[in-house]
């Protein structure tokens, strides 16, 4: 079990500093691959459409996911509902490279997340704070991402979640060892993971940014805040020029510390996706999960 988990963590490390793009068909997947995406997330509706159309959002049609797998050479991920381990079994059976237990879909279980250690395929999960991140890692997640607020084109929640996780890790490093068990109890997180963060000052897995990233500057901002890579959902294919924006976000993620490059790749991209103000949302996806 431990060897398998270490392998999954190492596989996740291979996509560090890359961009993962949401796609709804093979054509979009090819655009993402040509733009330099390190992986694609296959789903039937991007988060902005899920938010707009409402209803129950479930995992995507396996046939559509397999078509995307066959269309590209890069890894293909797909989403399942929180707690829906049968959807995860189906995705593992059709050969996805990673499963996202995602708050963007309608939760199937309001008590438990999936026990990810039951699967060979690696999982990524969202987190708003250190406690959520460590609980998901304790369940077997090989990768963490900020929850942000998907489908809004508004990066503020992703920034909040990344800053929260970073500040809580710094605080943990300053906590006396005899108090760590109390912290573990308060966070509901495994003690060995609390010890790891207190000693190393970082998560034991990679942490990507997700939720509301719409521009090259957004991607560079999250990288400068300490993220290991970027998920882009609605921000590319809901923009005026998906191909140009996809390439620009990939370049911004690579050269996130170079303002000259960032300025150049931000030119002439056309309109970004229309954004939403968080305070006016009827449903906040980030509140899902625990």
Curated annotation (Swiss-Prot):
Subunit structure: In the presence of PdxT, forms a dodecamer of heterodimers.
UniProt keyword annotations, A-Z: Lyase, Pyridoxal phosphate, Schiff base
PROSITE patterns, sorted: PDXS_SNZ_1, PDXS_SNZ_2
Residues involved in D-glyceraldehyde 3-phosphate binding: 163
Pathway: Cofactor biosynthesis; pyridoxal 5'-phosphate biosynthesis
Reaction catalysis annotation: aldehydo-D-ribose 5-phosphate + D-glyceraldehyde 3-phosphate + L-glutamine = pyridoxal 5'-phosphate + L-glutamate + phosphate + 3 H2O + H(+)
This protein's name: Pyridoxal 5'-phosphate synthase subunit PdxS
Catalytic residue list: 79
Alphabetized Pfam families for the sequence: SOR_SNZ (PF01680)
Role summary: Catalyzes the formation of pyridoxal 5'-phosphate from ribose 5-phosphate (RBP), glyceraldehyde 3-phosphate (G3P) and ammonia. The ammonia is provided by the PdxT subunit. Can also use ribulose 5-phosphate and dihydroxyacetone phosphate as substrates, resulting from enzyme-catalyzed isomerization of RBP and G3P, respectively.
Gene that produces this protein: pdxS
GO molecular function, one term: pyridoxal 5'-phosphate synthase (glutamine hydrolysing) activity
Highest classification ranks of the organism: Bacteria, Bacillati, Bacillota, Clostridia, Eubacteriales
EC top class, as a word: lyase
């Amino acid at each position: 079990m431990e060897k398998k988990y270490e392998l999954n963590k190492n596989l996740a490390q291979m996509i560090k500093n890359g961009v993962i793009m949401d796609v709804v068909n093979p054509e979009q997947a090819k655009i993402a691959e040509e733009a330099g995406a390190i992986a694609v997330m296959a789903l039937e509706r991007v988060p902005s459409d899920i938010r707009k159309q409402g209803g129950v959002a479930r995992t995507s049609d396996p046939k559509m996911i397999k078509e995307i797998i066959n269309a590209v050479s890069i890894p293909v991920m797909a989403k399942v509902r929180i707690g829906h381990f049968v959807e995860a079994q189906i995705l593992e059976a059709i050969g996805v490279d990673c499963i996202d237990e995602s708050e963007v879909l309608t939760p199937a279980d309001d008590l438990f997340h999936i026990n990810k250690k039951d699967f060979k395929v690696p999982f990524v999960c969202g987190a708003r704070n250190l406690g959520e991140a460590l609980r998901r890692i304790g369940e077997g997640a090989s990768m963490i991402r900020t929850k942000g607020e998907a489908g809004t084109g508004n990066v503020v929640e992703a920034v909040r979640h990344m800053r929260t996780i970073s500040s809580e890790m710094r605080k943990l490093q300053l906590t006396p060892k005899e108090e760590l068990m109390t912290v573990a109890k308060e966070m509901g997180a495994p003690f060995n993971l609390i010890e790891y963060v207190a000693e190393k000052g970082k998560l034991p897995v990679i942490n990507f940014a997700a939720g509301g990233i719409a521009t090259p500057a957004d991607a560079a901002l999250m990288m400068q805040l300490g993220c290991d890579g970027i998920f882009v959902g609605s921000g590319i294919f809901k923009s005026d020029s998906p191909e140009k924006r996809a390439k620009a976000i990939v370049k911004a993620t690579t050269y996130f510390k170079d303002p000259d490059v960032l300025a150049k790749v931000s030119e002439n991209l056309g309109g970004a996706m229309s954004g939403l103000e968080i305070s006016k949302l009827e449903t906040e996806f980030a509140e899902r999960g625990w």
